[in-house]
């Protein structure tokens, strides 16, 4: 990884690799701030982006374990506004070109991104992309309750359960947590996950007194060529003051900041053991591919991702590709748009966390190489 820092492909990276529950390697290389020559330390704070999703997934599964919601409950049981959905017809040219949904959205479908919701990010030029952006669904000034109202006025991309599309589903689940628990999302996460696991630096913004520990964010030289050297500072992504001050919208899909030790604490809590956050059956279910046989996840800008299904809150590898470690069948993993990544592979008895701040993406050649080497090092 030092080579990639020297080549200006990544500014810096922190990682921890586990064999079973034991940390066998933990290091930081490179910079937290290249311009200031600030060397990266374990206590530096990263923008988690979509690493946030696993926290909200765990919150939902805690409520499921307590019997307060069910995985196959219709969403209107918690959020009546999202009942009686409309779906865009095949080949629709306007938001009015819709038909009734064949079935309601379920909690399970929200966890697996099979609900029919979209993101309004990855599919520019489409009818739904335009609709999401005109409604400003992702506006950080919009509280979760108001975001649900905006989504209620928009059609689904496909019938619930009939496809896979990365989406605002986890933000919707954040609102479900609030409605079911009676607490704000940040309060629930703090009480049930952050405090329970001793996570002292994870939250929806970095307090002013700690902002000197926030890692600088950089753009790569070319979004389409992640191996092209060159980094440009981009601290105002995805919007000015993001992660530096509180915003009304507590984004369950991408709003948290965290550190390597905090992320490591969560990953360890998702491994079998007496101090696991969730029950063994719950963890097994989360790490089980929920998609139909042969179906893979896909992104509008990338196409299908070979060998990858989806569990409850993360991708599941059912057929490793040449980019993957050969013994990664059953690996449960996800990451964030600014270069954070976590994985758990029960079969290979390994898990890990990788933290960088290079926008955009976590499925890049340098991370693939790191993970292959990590698996080799632990015998996986």
Per-region residue spans from a language model:
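Short beta-to-alpha loop/turn elements within the nucleotide-binding domains of ABC transporters
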Residues: 27, 73, 183
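Short, surface-exposed loop or secondary-structure junction motifs
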Residues: 77, 85-326
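Active-site SXXK
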Residues: 1, 21, 47-78, 84-85, ...
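Short, well-ordered beta-strand elements
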Residues: 337, 342-343, 349-358
């Amino acid at each position: 990884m030092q080579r990639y820092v020297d080549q200006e492909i990544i500014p810096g990276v922190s990682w921890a690799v586990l064999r079973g529950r034991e940390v066998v390697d933990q290091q930081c290389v490179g910079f937290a701030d290249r311009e200031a020559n600030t060397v990266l330390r374990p206590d530096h704070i990263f923008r988690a982006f979509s690493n946030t999703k696993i926290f909200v997934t765990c919150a939902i599964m805690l409520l499921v374990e307590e019997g307060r919601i069910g995985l196959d409950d219709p969403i209107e049981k918690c959020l009546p506004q999202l009942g009686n959905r409309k779906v865009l017809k095949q080949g629709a040219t306007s938001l009015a070109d819709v038909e009734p949904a064949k079935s309601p959205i379920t909690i399970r479908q929200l966890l697996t991104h099979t609900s029919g919701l979209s993101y309004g990010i990855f599919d520019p030029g489409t009818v739904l992309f335009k609709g999401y952006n005109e409604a400003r669904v992702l506006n950080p000034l919009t509280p979760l309750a108001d975001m649900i109202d905006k989504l209620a006025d928009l059609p689904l991309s496909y019938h619930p359960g009939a496809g896979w599309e990365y989406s605002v589903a986890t933000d919707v689940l954040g609102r479900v947590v609030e409605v079911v628990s009676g607490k704000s999302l940040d309060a629930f996460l703090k009480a049930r996950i952050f405090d329970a696991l001793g996570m002292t630096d994870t939250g929806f913004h970095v307090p002013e007194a700690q902002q000197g520990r926030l890692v600088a964010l950089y753009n790569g030289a070319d979004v389409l060529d992640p191996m092209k050297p060159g980094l440009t500072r981009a601290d105002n992504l995805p919007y000015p003051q993001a992660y530096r001050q509180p915003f009304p919208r507590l984004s369950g899909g991408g709003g948290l900041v965290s550190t390597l030790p905090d992320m490591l604490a969560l990953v360890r809590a998702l491994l079998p053991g007496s101090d696991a956050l969730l029950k063994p059956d719950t963890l097994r279910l989360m790490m089980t591919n929920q998609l139909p046989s042969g179906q893979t996840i896909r992104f509008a800008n990338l196409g299908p991702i070979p060998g990858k299904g989806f569990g409850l809150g993360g991708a599941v590898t059912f057929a490793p590709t040449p980019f993957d470690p050969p013994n990664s069948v059953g690996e449960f993993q996800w990451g964030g748009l600014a270069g954070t990544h976590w994985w758990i592979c029960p079969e290979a008895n390994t898990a890990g966390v990788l933290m960088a701040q290079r926008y955009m993406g976590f499925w890049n050649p340098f991370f693939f190489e790191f993970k292959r080497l990590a698996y080799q090092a632990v015998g996986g």
